[in-house]
Amino acid sequence: MVTIRLARGGAKKRPFYQVVVADSRNSRDGRFIEKVGFFNPTAQGQAEKLRLDLDRITHWVGQGATVSDRVAKLVKDATAA
């Protein structure tokens, strides 16, 4: 099953997440199909906190991909802003 979820990157105590489309059987930070955005929870000042390609996310959801709880919340926040 294909899922849209967060893949963690960044340094220790400084998380940075890529929003990726991946097979649910692959590991969290492992192989993915496509990057559809990023989320930087520690962004300060003028730094960009969230960027999502909503067209690609809706495409993958239309193809049957499931969305993780956290990504669903991020998409909701992005569409409201």
From Swiss-Prot:
GO (cellular component) term, any one: small ribosomal subunit
InterPro entries per record: Ribosomal_bS16 (IPR000307), Ribosomal_bS16_CS (IPR020592), Ribosomal_bS16_dom_sf (IPR023803)
UniProt KW Protein transport keyword: no
Keywords of this entry: Ribonucleoprotein, Ribosomal protein
Gene3D superfamilies: 3.30.1320.10
Gene Ontology biological-process entries: translation
Molecular functions (GO terms): structural constituent of ribosome
Classification via NCBIfam families: S16
Similarity comment: Belongs to the bacterial ribosomal protein bS16 family.
UniProt-recorded name of the protein: Small ribosomal subunit protein bS16
Organism encoding this protein: Colwellia psychrerythraea (strain 34H / ATCC BAA-681)
Lineage, top ranks: Bacteria, Pseudomonadati, Pseudomonadota, Gammaproteobacteria, Alteromonadales
